[in-house]
Amino acid sequence: MAKEKIEIVVANDDTRIEKVDQVLPPIALLEKYPASEQAAALVKQTRHEAHNIIHGKDDRLLVVIGPCSIHDPKAAIEYATRLKPLREKYKDSLEIIMRVYFEKPRTTVGWKGLINEPYLNDTYRLNDGLRIARKLLSDINDLGVPAAGEFLDMITPQYLADFMSWGAIGARTTESQVHRELASGLSCAVGFKNATNGGVKVALDAIGAAEAPHYFLSVTKFGHSAIVSTKGNEDCHIILRGGDKGPNYSAEDVEKVCADIEKTGRIPHVMVDFSHANSSKQYKKQMDVCQDVCNQIAFGSKQIFGVMVESHLVEGRQDLVDGKAQTYGQSITDACIGWEDSERLLQQLSDAVIARRKATSN
């Protein structure tokens, strides 16, 4: 009878699984690409700066800027190399963190990011993707540019999170219980986007949930299944990204959301995503959103503490076409503003912060 029961269990298990491949344990990549002293110090300092901005102790603007997604490490390094002097130039007014997104949530199907599909040819060499991602994060941090990423599952943070200075939970996963639990244990600040329908309640609920301790299932650095116990994350905040009914970056929208935040007892301020529904998915409109947000800041508003921008070396986007060479430095997911517009945008944001200081000191 015992043998028969075992056979039944096996026969009914994994009936839709094609195959199962082993993944490298996190420790293998942490030992291969350890964080240098310089990189570790940068991450620690940037997390501290983000904490101070989020908690109203620093009047600078937190700026998360970079490609929609990373598909070409060489272009990512060039972007970081160009961003470094701008981070230094505007350090008194902006805390600039590079957007380094390796995983892409999809509404239906599509390329899921460099970790899942590093070679863009449907081979799904996930172990290689993890290696490439960690090596790239190491190189970017060693350049003196801190990194930001989106967290989509409970396991990849064990491979990469020590290099992340700020994290995001996307609009499609903000309502997810496991992502709220994950955020409660991440060592960096985490932004929750409002829902795709534009609603902000799910994000505010997520912040409250992530502030509390949780238990969840993940893996250890050695790859063993484990129960993770968290302390709670006090550095969570909302990101306004617009919704099905339109943008939500206007002064009126920000005021309304801040009133809701104030009711929760938290500091009433927000991060604004210049892209996605706030730009109606038209990448050039990010510059219009920037101008509106800069006006709010320059007139003295302290309700916007941070912004998010989709930017690349070359503006626009491209499709992956077999046999056709890719345009170097151009997105293969959401369209981005190009480098020249990115430089102008950062100058405008810096000027707005300086103007706010003058407006509030009078």
From Swiss-Prot:
It catalyses: D-erythrose 4-phosphate + phosphoenolpyruvate + H2O = 7-phospho-2-dehydro-3-deoxy-D-arabino-heptonate + phosphate. Disulfide bonds: none annotated. It is an enzyme of class 2 (transferase). Pathway: Metabolic intermediate biosynthesis; chorismate biosynthesis; chorismate from D-erythrose 4-phosphate and phosphoenolpyruvate: step 1/7. The keyword Transferase applies. GO terms for cellular component: cytoplasm. It comes from the Bacteria. One of its GO terms (molecular function) is 3-deoxy-7-phosphoheptulonate synthase activity. Its EC number is 2.5.1.54. Signal peptide: none annotated. The keyword Transferase applies. GO terms for biological process: amino acid biosynthetic process; aromatic amino acid family biosynthetic process; chorismate biosynthetic process. Keywords: Amino-acid biosynthesis, Aromatic amino acid biosynthesis, Transferase. Stereospecific condensation of phosphoenolpyruvate (PEP) and D-erythrose-4-phosphate (E4P) giving rise to 3-deoxy-D-arabino-heptulosonate-7-phosphate (DAHP). Belongs to the class-I DAHP synthase family. PANTHER family: PHOSPHO-2-DEHYDRO-3-DEOXYHEPTONATE ALDOLASE DAHP SYNTHETASE (PTHR21225), PHOSPHO-2-DEHYDRO-3-DEOXYHEPTONATE ALDOLASE, TYROSINE-INHIBITED (PTHR21225:SF12). This is Phospho-2-dehydro-3-deoxyheptonate aldolase.
